[in-house]
């Protein structure tokens, strides 16, 4: 067994010595270490002033890192000092134990390190701590470590939404697409949510924004125009193409299938082709590509909307607005002359968003980084079996994307 002096040296409980050690008789039980204060200089925890008088002493049970197979409990006489500077009783400042903490700083640090690759429940079980204790430790660490953005260097933003829970509950995430840092997260996806983001910005930050990448959410655009009127809106390719797939390709596929009620084999082929039509051709294997080609050759409306989808994508890759506008006019004319109702309707609606497509030529932004963040958010939720503490969840997300070093 370790003797008292060796235990004192290994423990490193600054300002305290080991009075006695109670070893358990059975393995896996609790090792109790009774400490006694030895520091001659006592400092106020609040102001750091030297104090001479002890107001009161209470014994606190504090968990420390395990020793071998034993869980360690420290019995710490916690002194409250009379501080002349503060004008009242204050706790003594300790280098290894925080105010009101029931675990040592090194145990808290060990929990934080494990939480980077595990979840609260697993870490709590490993150290035999309460779930809420581990969560509180990690939350305090995140509050201290998550750095605030340097708004003086941020000129571009990307805004998107992600699902908080099942049942259509959402939150808005704002990202620096250049520095790859999550800047802000707020509950909801309404104008009020976007307004809350702009209202918390430091003076002058909103006026430095040059462009914001968003989907076609009107709520975001209205608040951007209200708070950063100089910023250009850039509509994201992914969201526009996804909307085209839902409102045009899927609608035409269903209409074509309904026209083939008498030809069940052909109808079955079209009904089961949704995945083939919506997925990028580059992601299809050879057999799937052959099936797609056969389907498009046999159905002119599906071929039309499929080809126009690829033409629509090209609008985002022009570097000159004049060329992009010319390509848009050509695409719009083809859509109008197609005779396909769903395509005509989509083209009419998209015309009102043309400014956000042309702005992509001047500001090559997209929300792809936000989509990557959304995938990480799913992993964080899955690892934690969901988060009931919204602030803790948002801190986890911000910690996962601290940004590139500038």
UniProtKB/Swiss-Prot annotation:
Kindly state which keywords UniProt assigns to this record, in alphabetical order. DNA recombination, DNA-binding, Transposable element, Transposition
Q: Which residues form a coiled coil?
A: none
Highest taxon, organism lineage: Bacteria
Q: Which Pfam families does the entry link to?
A: DDE_Tnp_ISL3, HTH_Tnp_ISL3, Zn_ribbon_ISL3
Q: Name one GO molecular function term.
A: DNA binding
Gene Ontology biological process terms from the UniProt entry? DNA recombination; transposition
**What is the protein's known function?**
Involved in the transposition of the insertion sequence.
> Of which family is this protein a member?
Belongs to the transposase 12 family.
Q: What is this protein called?
A: Transposase for insertion sequence element IS1001
Lineage runs: Bacteria, Pseudomonadati, Pseudomonadota, Betaproteobacteria, Burkholderiales
